[in-house]
């Protein structure tokens, strides 16, 4: 949630505005591009609280194919820019694998999407590692900070 985020307007004018064409993940791309323009300070403190219930619009939309396509744009952008370290990279690829297999779409399109993402190293091994790390963090009651 970026409701309390502050950035310099001059930096906004320096970024490409392709995020405005995205309907689901444009804010992700916006914040990535803004972060590339300067220093970022992070406060590791939960400042607001919200939860999603199964009937919320966010949960219903979450599995749609269009949103998946936008997420793939975001992740391939991050991977191409080499913004993530090796561990983050592997976990993010596991997350992408999970998103693809859980998205409600035709099996043939799902297989094609997975095949397309293999060139980025998105594999079932990455998926298993991401799931194991998430489960361990839940069992140990720790928040993974990458």
Question: What is each model feature region?
Answer:
Residues 90-103:
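Amphipathic alpha-helical repeat scaffolds of TPR domains
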Residues 80, 101-146:
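Membrane-interface aromatic/basic loop that binds lipid-linked glycans or pyrophosphate carriers
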Residues 15-17, 76, 128-131:
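A general secondary-structure boundary signal
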Residues 40-41, 93, 110-112:
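Short hydrophobic/aromatic segments of transmembrane alpha-helices and their interfaces
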Residues 47-54, 59-86, 109-121:
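Catalytic core of nucleotide-sugar-dependent glycosyltransferases
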Residues 16, 85-88:
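Inter-domain helical "communication" segments and dimerization helices
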Residues 1-64, 71:
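Conserved nucleotide-sugar donor-binding catalytic segment
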């Amino acid at each position: 949630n970026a409701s309390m985020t502050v950035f310099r307007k001059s930096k906004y004018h320096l970024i490409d505005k392709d995020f405005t064409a995205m309907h689901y993940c444009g804010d992700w791309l916006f914040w990535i591009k803004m972060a590339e323009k300067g220093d970022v300070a992070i406060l590791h403190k939960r400042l607001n609280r919200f939860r999603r219930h199964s009937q919320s619009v966010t949960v219903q939309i979450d599995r749609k194919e269009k949103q998946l396509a936008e997420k793939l744009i975001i992740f391939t952008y991050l991977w191409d820019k080499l913004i993530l370290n090796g561990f983050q990279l592997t976990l993010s690829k596991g997350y992408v694998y999970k998103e693809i297999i859980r998205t409600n779409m035709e099996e043939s399109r799902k297989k094609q999407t997975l095949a397309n993402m293999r060139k980025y190293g998105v594999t079932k091994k990455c998926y298993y590692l991401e799931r194991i790390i998430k489960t361990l963090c839940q069992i140990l009651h720790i928040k993974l900070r990458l």
